[in-house]
């Protein structure tokens, strides 16, 4: 049973977009690895931008700086 864990910034991603991510990730494993879509698990974790850092700066701060 393959498991895909997708981490995204908590950014008002709509349920429809999350459904697209789940469908797309599942299909990718079917197409590339021949996995059964019925046993493929996709988890989407939304991370608060204060808890996500890039280059030593939180995503919240990077956005304020226009980076």
Predicted regions, residues:
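A domain-level signal for the structural core that forms small-molecule/cofactor-binding pockets
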Residues: 2-67
């Amino acid at each position: 049973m393959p498991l895909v864990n997708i981490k995204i910034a908590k950014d008002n991603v709509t349920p429809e977009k999350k459904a697209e991510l789940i469908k797309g990730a599942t299909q990718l494993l079917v197409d590339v690895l021949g996995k059964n879509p019925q046993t493929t698990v996709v988890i989407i974790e939304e991370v608060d931008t204060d808890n996500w850092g890039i280059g030593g700066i939180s995503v919240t701060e990077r956005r304020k700086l226009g980076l």
